[in-house]
Amino acid sequence: MRKSILLLCVWGVCALAHADRMMDIIQNYNAKTMSVHEMDSVLALKVETLASNNRYRLEYENEQKLFRHSFFADYYLVDTQKGNARTQISDVPVRDAMMSPNGKYVVYAKADNNLYIYKVDFKTEVAITNDANTEIFNGISDWLYEEEFGITGLFAFSPDNKQVAFVRLDETEVPTFSWQTYLADDEDQLSNKGLYPQLHSLRYPKAGAPNAKASICVYDIHYKTIRTMELPANMDGYLPRITWTPLTKPTKKDEQPASDLVILHLNRDQNKMDVLKGNPKSTVCHLFYSEESKKYFVNYELFDQWQWLNDGRVIVLSEKEGYTQAYMYNSQGIEQRTLTPEERDITKVYGYDPVTQTLYYQAANTPMTRQAYALNIKKNVTTCLTQGEGTHDLHFSADWKHYIQCYHSTTTPHTYTLYKAMGNGQWAKNKVVLDNDSILKAWQALGVNEKEFFPITTERGDVLNAWRILPKNFDKTKKYPVVMLQYSGPTSQRVLNNWRKRFGYALADAGYLVVNVDGRGTGARGREWRNATYMQLGVKEAEDQISAAKYLKTLPYVDGNRMAICGWSYGGYQTLMCLSKQQEMVWQCGIAIAPVTSWRLYDSAYTERFMRRPQVNDLGYEGTDLMKMAGDLTGELLIVHGLADDNVHAQNTLIYTDALVKAGKQFEMQLYVDDNHSIRKPHNNKHLHHRIMLFLEKNL
């Protein structure tokens, strides 16, 4: 599969920038004639993968959403050498289609949870597996792997195009969660079809419950055989990533280029990560790399940034020394040296150029900003490629001779600029591809104040990063009500210098001072800061939000008797925790949307990553259970939930509100029928934001 420059424009269109032509943006439907101004007629088409020979590409349309990331769609193989002739690879919608590196095969899954392979030269389909059912998943994620490991396709082609490795998940022992939906089509609501709710069921392991059993299989494309890899006997937990090492050159005349299968394993508590190398012929695996933390979880996501070099070495990312840094390991898994001994977190790796021996990456120079860097490993010289406060991201061409820089900040929308390599580590600006000046002018015409970043020192002496949006027509001699927005989840960040125009600006336009504070546990401030909330989610975050609110009350333009806190999902949980922990009336009201209310009710992978299992951390679960704090809630409350939420089940809100009733607490509640965790149905989303405004007007 060819690595192209991928450009995500502000309206969400995936396009290609042809590095050789440099001057043009090429739309994914017609790579020879269409420019950025001609995209509107083909917005329904999306590019999935491209073959390394540039002849074929996959496109899909008619997307049918499944869960957060997964979807079924009609996939087409496009032959650029035959006038972009399109061939549908299956007569039914499929998911997670991926093209082999040489463009001769496409692997995908169908609704029966089996894997299939389409042979391009013969235009034929062959079933790779046939044993799947509603509890067996071959090569694709179940709900848990998709939601908490951010992956949908659990398979990978070998670099020689001869084998497909895949993860097999068996959910047979996983408990089932069920919910109902109530709405039929408008015309059918009072017919027989709409008289009875529909029941939906999902295998959903809550904290401490049995997980799916995972195994690794390898399919030989020529012989149509499947082998199961022999994992060590103590391998319990998760297998969220598989890949292959690059082909190595043979040392003898009769040898063929070889590649190892690479398997990432996490134990159940996710505080130990093992990387295995496996021989698909013998099925034997051996340990290549292991990392364990006694104090926290091991960040498996860093594995996605590892760079496997053609000579067998690998650039490993780890936060084992306090910050996310890069290390060079040899082919035997022995550390050779630290590549980036800096006190800042690497946030993304763009890749490694073997010709210049340069590693390109993004790092948090400050927690609120992102800069891009080039590290010449041979010379041990690091160069910052970007300038200016804000967020910088790079998209490189396959030959590492061009990149598109995407820059944005709180005052600058996404601007895309093409750069060209000039040699000796120097880059020259070629042209601004897209500046979104019209969007900037339209935004400025609204007259809304921009975010201002400022520090808050807590009562215990920690310095928290925060931003504020002053009310429209701000007058420093007046006092204003405050709405504190927050998410607060572990490793997350909301205080970032980026172009993120959300609901907070509408609140500022309505006359509120809007503030967001990142407390302990949030990202880009090193391992120890992220460690702070381990085993007791919500407690220290609430301490920080309360301390920040007390500071805001001291400001001359803040009305300390009119303050609110609001959050969604983890932020909703944190809102309830804050209203339960405030010993004095810091906030007069709060809004909790789709909140977790007890970590025993949430899924195993996320919860146990930060809390471990209830069986080993009973005190942590008891001490963060909001049901047990219902009697401590102070201030007015609006609690909101979608009744078809497959992620944070409405069960959380319903059990919690029962506890509030038993404690004699009055509150407001808004339920959205047949809507999920995001409450994305247009009429519901509009209603929700109006409801928030009305609640704040009433209580502040």
Task: Give residue spans per PLM region.
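Positively charged n-region of N-terminal signal peptides that target proteins for export
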Residues: M1-S4
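Beta-propeller folds
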Residues: L7-W11, A17-F396, K401-H402, T412
